């Protein structure tokens, strides 16, 4: 597997692919889809600013429709899924051109399609659980395409109205996982036990996600079918590629 970091404006991708010919394809995908989003925002500024689901025009680009659908499912604005959706489109386009193994991580939001199992390491800021837990995405899920997305109220620059160290959502589509992580994270308010319960209750209301893992400090909770949890360490979580994943 070839490792590559790609940075274009606000988009910072950690990419793993099985052939370097897919690197330029990924760059072109980022440029094209960013332009599609930006041009749509010029005509419909509310697409950028809305914190609630919005309808998009019938002739909107595919990525805009995907983001709007994810926002509708998770009850958030479309931009809540932008990072995961860009990763999803990078993987989708590479697979259409014959790529067998690809992992795209965009600010903690991962889309992947691989022939082997993948361990996604947990990073939850200052929580003692950071770097100690990984989630093993088995071959069946990985080979069909999968999304693992993380939202945090204590790490990074993304908007969250909650205080969770990590909301990790697992779903077939990274776009839905990303929007759902944001939506669930907004409920992480108050004492850890109460906040985690509120997050898990919200997660139960969202369709099309497999499960969620919530971290607040030393406390954690889960809902649904999350991948097998495995012990890991900083060496594995911080691979030579990036901070979040590695194939096994």
Swiss-Prot record:
Residue ranges of coiled coil: none
Taxonomic superkingdom: Archaea
Family: Belongs to the UPF0280 family.
Protein name: UPF0280 protein Maeo_0343
High-level lineage: Archaea, Methanobacteriati, Methanobacteriota, Methanomada group, Methanococci
């Amino acid at each position: 597997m070839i490792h590559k970091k790609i940075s274009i404006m606000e988009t910072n991708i950690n990419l793993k692919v099985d052939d370097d010919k897919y690197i330029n394809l990924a760059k072109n995908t980022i440029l094209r889809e960013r332009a599609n989003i930006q041009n749509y925002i010029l005509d419909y500024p509310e697409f950028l600013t809305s914190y609630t689901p919005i309808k998009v025009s019938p002739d909107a680009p595919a990525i805009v429709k995907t983001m709007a659908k994810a926002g509708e499912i998770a009850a958030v604005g479309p931009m809540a899924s932008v990072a995961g959706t860009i990763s999803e489109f990078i993987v989708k386009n590479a697979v259409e051109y014959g790529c067998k193994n690809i992992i795209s991580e965009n600010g903690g939001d991962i889309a992947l399609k691989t022939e082997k199992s993948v361990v996604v390491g947990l990073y939850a800021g200052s929580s003692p659980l950071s770097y100690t837990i990984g989630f093993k995405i088995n071959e069946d899920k990985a080979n069909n395409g999968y999304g693992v997305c993380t939202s945090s109220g204590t790490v990074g620059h993304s908007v969250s109205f909650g205080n969770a160290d990590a909301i990790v959502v697992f779903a077939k589509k990274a776009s839905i996982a990303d929007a759902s992580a944001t939506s669930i994270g907004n409920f992480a308010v108050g004492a850890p036990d109460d906040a985690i319960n509120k997050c898990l209750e919200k997660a139960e209301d969202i369709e099309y996600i497999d499960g969620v893992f919530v971290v607040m400090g030393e406390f954690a909770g889960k809902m649904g079918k999350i991948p097998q949890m495995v012990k890991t360490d900083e060496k594995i979580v911080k691979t030579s590629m990036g901070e979040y994943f590695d194939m096994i």
